Amino acid sequence: MFRALPFTATVHPYAITAPRLVVKMSAIATKNTRVESLEVKPPAHPTYDLKGVMQLALSEDAGNLGDVTCKATIPVDMESDAHFLAKEDGIIAGIALAEMIFAEVDPSLKVEWYVNDGDKVHKGLKFGKVQGNAYNIVIAERVVLNFMQRMSGIATLTKEMADAAHPAYILETRKTAPGLRLVDKWAVLIGGGKNHRMGLFDMVMIKDNHISAAGGVGKALKSVDQYLEQNKLQIGVEVETRTIAEVREVLEYASQTKTSLTRIMLDNMVVPLSNGDIDVSMLKEAVELINGRFDTEASGNVTLETVHKIGQTGVTYISSGALTHSVKALDISLKIDTELALEVGRRTKRA
């Protein structure tokens, strides 16, 4: 089946349509790439330019001369198929973004998928193909794979962590690759996780440095409540706590004052033991103290091996920077159908 995404694209400067001209990229970028029909939509962001990110990735690859290897080796009129191949098991992600990139390079390329974002693939599975001008397929190949491999790696780890963390929800953090914040967080959603704050703008998060500068947890919370009221802002507020005493201080403040606080972070309350196990007694005590008055978030010493035990403490969320800051890319490839390419080459007397 052929499934195309509904968004507008024009012939990209990197694409080859007739003569091999090197054309520089347009400075015009569209922030609102159409994503309404996607099964898993990218998270909202007021300034993130997804089209611009795609264009930057293509531009840094093409440089000022374009693909000199393709120009030297691939006939400009050669048509071919190329198949996506999973080279290991995992969760596939980035299918929607791949279609956008192919359309950015050459809107005439036809992309067909046999899986959806979030589906499991196994080693050796051909999970999609692209048909059209061979030159333009190869131009898009590396950029498409760079995004898909990273996103699929994030989605694969997220799926494993989310399943193990149940009934708690797994979150990523702001520890994303620079410039890829939305893409990384999109992959987390595809993998079955939930998003933490997108940036510094959409949630107040009072951490240790803020608490130290304000003179304590209570004073920091009071300052935040005053700021939000004065500026008529309605956004979530989270405060970091590191000890049971700090949890008690937060709860005491909340019992005496109307507050915008929505979540309490329980940081490093998971203690590693010498035998490789973890002690979650402090975390469990904190969750019981809070007793559902606020959402809770466990942070620190979260791994695939520890997340299940953490999730059994009753905590609402578990956050892990490892989902995005040091993820292993999923090994996938895109290979041109050699026999078809040779057949076309023979017909055009170029093989």
Curated annotation (Swiss-Prot):
Expressed in roots and flowers. One of its GO terms (cellular component) is mitochondrion. Gene3D superfamilies: Aldolase class I, Quinolinate phosphoribosyl transferase, N-terminal domain. It is found in: Mitochondrion. One of its GO terms (biological process) is NAD biosynthetic process. InterPro entries: Aldolase_TIM, NadC, NadC/ModD, Nicotinate_pribotase-like_C, Quinolinate_PRibosylTase_N_sf, Quinolinate_PRibosylTrfase_C, Quinolinate_PRibosylTrfase_N. Its EC number is 2.4.2.19. Substrate binds at residues 142, 173-175, 197, 207, 240, 267, 299-301, 320-322. Belongs to the NadC/ModD family. Involved in the biosynthesis of pyridine alkaloid natural products, leading mainly to the production of anabasine, anatabine, nicotine and nornicotine, effective deterrents against herbivores with antiparasitic and pesticide properties (neurotoxins); nornicotine serves as the precursor in the synthesis of the carcinogen compound N'-nitrosonornicotine (NNN). Involved in the catabolism of quinolinic acid (QA). This is Quinolinate phosphoribosyltransferase [decarboxylating] 2a, mitochondrial. The gene is QPT2a.
